[in-house]
Amino acid sequence: MARRSLSNRQARREELVARHADRRAELKRLIAHPDTDPDVRADAVRQLARLPRDSSPVRLRNRDVIDGRPRGVLTRFGLSRVRFREMALRGELPGIRKASW
């Protein structure tokens, strides 16, 4: 089980990413476009650098939705490998069966 502070930090980062996503995308588009004036590009780089560090999606971590475990998360299910196995063996995941051949 992840510490509550880590889950709260992740939630705060998700909120910041969502809040600044449009502005960040617009600035990155300006920076990447080949026809952008160099002065405008430099200003866009400065504005991008002024955005909060935690508003970058790179700083998000995939976590288990139940207990917050940060590693071994199966993206398709949002569960860690440990939790996935437990729930699958108990029959709590529809359509998931243990392989047998």
UniProtKB/Swiss-Prot annotation:
Taxonomic superkingdom: Bacteria
Pfam families in the record: Ribosomal_S14
Annotated GO MF terms: rRNA binding; structural constituent of ribosome
Gene Ontology biological process terms, A to Z: translation
Keyword field: Ribonucleoprotein, Ribosomal protein, RNA-binding, rRNA-binding
Record-level GO cellular component terms: small ribosomal subunit
Assembly with partners or alone: Part of the 30S ribosomal subunit. Contacts proteins S3 and S10.
Sequence similarity: Belongs to the universal ribosomal protein uS14 family.
Protein's job: Binds 16S rRNA, required for the assembly of 30S particles and may also be responsible for determining the conformation of the 16S rRNA at the A site.
Name of the protein: Small ribosomal subunit protein uS14A
Organism encoding this protein: Salinispora tropica (strain ATCC BAA-916 / DSM 44818 / JCM 13857 / NBRC 105044 / CNB-440)
Gene that encodes the chain: rpsN
